[in-house]
Amino acid sequence: MDIHFKKLLLPILALFAMTAHAQSLSGLVTDEETGQPLEAVMISVLRNGTMIDYALTDARGRYSLPWKYNGSLQVSVSLLGYRREIRNISAAETLHIRLHSEAIALKEVQIRPGRIHGRKDTVRYNLAEFASSKDVHIKDVLKKLPGVDIDDNGQVKYKGKAIDHYFVEGMDVTGGRYSQINNNLSAKAVKSAEIMENYQSVKALKGKLSSDEIALNLKLDPQARDQWIINGTLGAGWSDGTQETTGTAQTKRDKGTLLWENAANALQLGKGKQSIYGYKSNNNGTDLSREQHILTNNTSQQIPLHGFLVQPGISAPLDKQRLLFNETHTLNANRMYKWNDERSLRLQAGYTHNRITQQRGNSQVYYQPDDTIRMDETYHYCLQNDATHMEIHYEDNKAIHYLSNRFLAESETNRGTSHELQQTMRTSQFTAKNFFSLIRNGEKYTWEFNSATQYAYLPSSLSLHDRKDKFIQHSLYNDNKASHLRKHNGFTRQYTAGIKGEWASVKHHSTRMETFGASSFSPYLSPYFQLEQGKWQGSLSLPLSYKRYFSQQRSFLFFNPSLYLRYQPDYHWKIFLYGSLHRSAGDVTDLCPFTYRTDYRTWKNTDGLFPVSTRQQYNLYGEYKNTVQEFFATATLSYRHVHYNTLNEQSISENRIVHSLRLHSNSTQILFLLSTLSKGFFDWNLKTSLDLQLSRNTGWQLTRVSDTDALTPQTETAGNGPPQKYRYDYLKMEPKLIWSPAEAFEAEYHATISYGGSKIGNDTHLAPLLDFVQRMHLTFSIGHVDLCLSGEHYRNDLNSDTHLNTLFVDASLIYKTRKWRVEASLSNLFNKKEYAYTTYSATQSYTSRLNIRPREVMVTAGYQF
């Protein structure tokens, strides 16, 4: 049977035809006197005295180097404290070396240890070589590491990809909410950071199923390990009055506001048990809610939920702390136990209360085939949010047995109000989830069972001056699957069979009661094959599923294959190719058979249609890393083509927007290039990086031009104008620099350059928008005092004739001792109070004007117990 499977699989994985093992130079390095193996010995291949390749010995003293050279070369074997050995070699062979210990006489010699060490799939950073006295928390050090970046939301990325696991001493105490560590753990408490690629978190699957996951592990200083680290912060300040514009263009001035900032947290991080407790509160624009967000990628335990009403977002291409008028309180508790490096129990709970206000005005321009419609609105908006979560996770992670059960309960309520729009929107979500996994390893086979269950209750309402719409959603979801796996001679076969079902009920209260169901049932089978041959690896997934929608009396057969090929010639290079085909049907909001409102002037109507999409995706990825040179580079070229059986139609009038589904075959295409470059310079204490994004997005939009009522059911496109084709091109570059030439000075620079233009139909070309943001942060240190100066310059186009220049300047003075940290800060020195920006989307342009935080003064005092 194995022979038949290989004959079927190998033609598909054509690149695997090269199955011969590459020749290699390998051997063992030991101590001449003791015979003990030596770790971290540098094995260098030299040509005319120049190093062309290298490897390090592992903990057992072994090394291996792919041999792809012709002619006579030299192999140098060196380790500090031992005499260097040089051998001539002309072909791959097994070369064992015994090193003689040697005393070292140092005279006016400076030994410079490496800051980064790489071995196989692990990169280790010595944080002492990157940290400075100006770094407060561990996030301040992590962002200095070549190859590592932290985005505005606090998410840690390695070579442009978000990490999948965040450990401290091998334990995930926050369950992915690692901002609670990044924003609170002292930079001095961490000794080193490890990045582990191709990380397989389940020991029972190691060596059987490959993984593309990335894990970050922090190793603490021995003096900080298992010790309680307790911090407290108190702060107060004053905010200047804001300038507000009403709907009649009259201007008034608010009085000043008293500011506060309070925080208390306690951390105990060790190898057997860990705890993190914290409370924070402020109204100075700092977004504390991010500390409760799960930032790691864990798609296997995410069950999507879709609501009918969505609260308006408070966002702009501006640092969030400048536009967020908030009152926030957040509380979290985390406790984790670990026994025998295998069994663990994690307990978590958290709560956030957030009240956000914003005043803004919007101008939306809709470009239709025969007309252009402009809609303006100016309003005050208040959003109150309360969110809680509670989690219990038990795991028994052995090589022959794996058991995991994770229970999670979450609730979130939102109330958004605008008096000018006479609109109040309430959205809530209450969920209870349980994820169970069991794996058993036999002599030849591996058995696995997984179960996922979720109950969700989503009440929501939209209150207007003349009516109230109310939705009540219930959903019970269950997915059970079992799999059988075997690996033999580098060839893995896994067969998974499961049953997935959802009971979904929706009630809509408006002028009358309307109900509908979106329940479904789906058995599925998913064969998976993986082949490893030397430098090559490939996998083929062939999932097949049947899905039945009971209320709609519709059935679908989905076949969603995917192919993955990877070539890794050596430690430095990695190339992979990915292709997939995915067919899916609409979610519960697409299946709604009646018309409903989403805000005070917008309606949505599906006309009872059943949207089905087919997506093709192709990715080509390449990366290069050189830890000795502190250089990391990646590039991704991707193409996505999605075919739809329905097309979105928009009908725009002076006081109403209607989005309807119409039967019309169409497609969208997205082509994009992503690239990241990161380079460290040891001698200059400098890190530079560049992120590049280039994309083209094309699609179709249908616009109603007849006088018929847009809310009248109409499944054909007759009577409407022809579909408009749109194209949007976008370029974005982000150069960054962090430079610490001396203990007394540090500089940080971050620029964002974006350029985007849109074409609608054959005649409408929207002027390209150029947005240029520069951020500079300088720190000067004299003894216990730091002086920080920050500047931000925003230059952005509003239209073809108008652009806006906005300059922000901040300053702070910090006094610090071993226990105390006192800071006086002045933000927005020039007292800028308004900001505006323009964006393009499909067949419309959107210009927004909003109030921003005025000049503010804050004084905070922090103490570490």
Which residues does each predicted region cover?
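Membrane-proximal, glycine/serine-rich, low-complexity loop/turn segments characteristic
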Residues: 28, 32, 60-62, 83, ...
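Conserved C-terminal beta-signal and adjacent last beta-strands/turns
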Residues: 732-753, 763-865
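A short, solvent-exposed loop/turn motif at the edges and junctions
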Residues: 46-50, 72-87, 863
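Face-selective signature of the C-terminal outer-membrane beta-barrel domain
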Residues: 332, 336-354, 382-552, 568, ...
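Short, ordered, surface-exposed loop/turn motifs in non-cytosolic proteins
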Residues: 33-47
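Outer-membrane beta-barrel translocator domains and adjoining extracellular loop/strand segments
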Residues: 89, 206-207, 244-248, 279, ...
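Short, acidic Ser/Thr/Gly-rich low-complexity loop/linker segments typical of extracellular
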Residues: 49-62
